[in-house]
Amino acid sequence: MFGPAKGRHFGVHPAPGFPGGVSQQAAGTKAGPAGAWPVGSRTDTMWRLRCKAKDGTHVLQGLSSRTRVRELQGQIAAITGIAPGGQRILVGYPPECLDLSNGDTILEDLPIQSGDMLIIEEDQTRPRSSPAFTKRGASSYVRETLPVLTRTVVPADNSCLFTSVYYVVEGGVLNPACAPEMRRLIAQIVASDPDFYSEAILGKTNQEYCDWIKRDDTWGGAIEISILSKFYQCEICVVDTQTVRIDRFGEDAGYTKRVLLIYDGIHYDPLQRNFPDPDTPPLTIFSSNDDIVLVQALELADEARRRRQFTDVNRFTLRCMVCQKGLTGQAEAREHAKETGHTNFGEV
């Protein structure tokens, strides 16, 4: 069967005897997974915070609602030169000191919100930071521990989701020919549990869905990502360049690994971390505790959004490649497909 041997080789283990059974609300459509996401997937949102220190006001970059306290302190250290152990972070009026005792606390669990101004002071009751911990040293440390995340472009051939997932779980193997087997795998899983994968979930009968997903002109979405997350037993994070958010599939399942995709409204690409040493292969599988990679993914999405590198699926112009009718947005495309049975669309 597709996946198990190579998945194990790279540390992503398909679930033994996997029958399906992932909670979800709506199937992906020809226009991708915009809209409802599976129950249990979680969204990260980018946060914008400022900090005020002795040398002025600074903008803190690359934070999300799930950034940990220790990562926030690392960035503050890079800006101010105050070691994390000597920081006092105050917020509000009158200013109150945040509890920094647990470095694993995430920002959304603190009494702060995006847009707040943080006041940074040095705790005079603690030993002063050593001369080696300067702004320059801290900045170098942060740069070394935050390698750049990059996108690998895969073919836009209606199977970009499957090619992208294969790429990341196989440790950086680009193989568009994997798509038919992945489609058959998903069809087998769905067919094995018709009670769960009902028409209410799939938007069509179980048999119709299985026939549909095996075609090479249909697009994958939330349903397929959820199934692949459980099959490979890893969290699949999809960062959206239009909304600058991350939807996380399989987060609550206790998986120890995560992989990342970037989505622009109609196309998926895999994300990977490259290293300066050309002999070191790119990293595509991350620890599920590595929240730094999530922040980097949000930064990448935010940059793409500012450059308008996304497609608004509710407004983009399509043409039915069967009858050549012009359509606007995924809603019209979905209705046209329902009325005519035509499902091959191209973007104009």
UniProtKB/Swiss-Prot annotation:
Cellular location(s): Cytoplasm
Chain spans, region Variable-loop: 213-223
Annotated EC: 3.4.19.12
Region (Cys-loop): 154-160
Ranges where the record places region Disordered: 1-39
Zn finger residue spans: C2H2-type: 318-342
Pfam family, one: zf-C2H2_OTU1_C
Molecular function in Gene Ontology: cysteine-type deubiquitinase activity; deubiquitinase activity; K48-linked deubiquitinase activity; K63-linked deubiquitinase activity; ubiquitin protein ligase binding; zinc ion binding
Keyword GTP-binding: no
His-loop: annotated span: 263-267
Coiled-coil regions listed: none
Domain notes: The UBAX-like region mediates the interaction with VCP. According to PubMed:19818707, it corresponds to a UBX domain, which is a hallmark for VCP-associated proteins. However, no canonical UBX is detected by prediction tools such as Pfam or PROSITE. The C2H2-type zinc finger mediates specificity for 'Lys-27'-, 'Lys-29'- and 'Lys-33'-linked polyubiquitin chains but not for 'Lys-11'-linked ubiquitin chains. Selectivity for 'Lys-11'-linked ubiquitin chains is provided by recognition of the sequence surrounding 'Lys-11' in ubiquitin. The S2 site region provides specificity for longer 'Lys-11'-linked ubiquitin chains.
Known role: Hydrolase that can remove conjugated ubiquitin from proteins and participates in endoplasmic reticulum-associated degradation (ERAD) for misfolded lumenal proteins. May act by triming the ubiquitin chain on the associated substrate to facilitate their threading through the VCP/p97 pore. Ubiquitin moieties on substrates may present a steric impediment to the threading process when the substrate is transferred to the VCP pore and threaded through VCP's axial channel. Mediates deubiquitination of 'Lys-27'-, 'Lys-29'- and 'Lys-33'-linked polyubiquitin chains.
Name of the protein in question: Ubiquitin thioesterase OTU1
Gene expressing this chain: YOD1
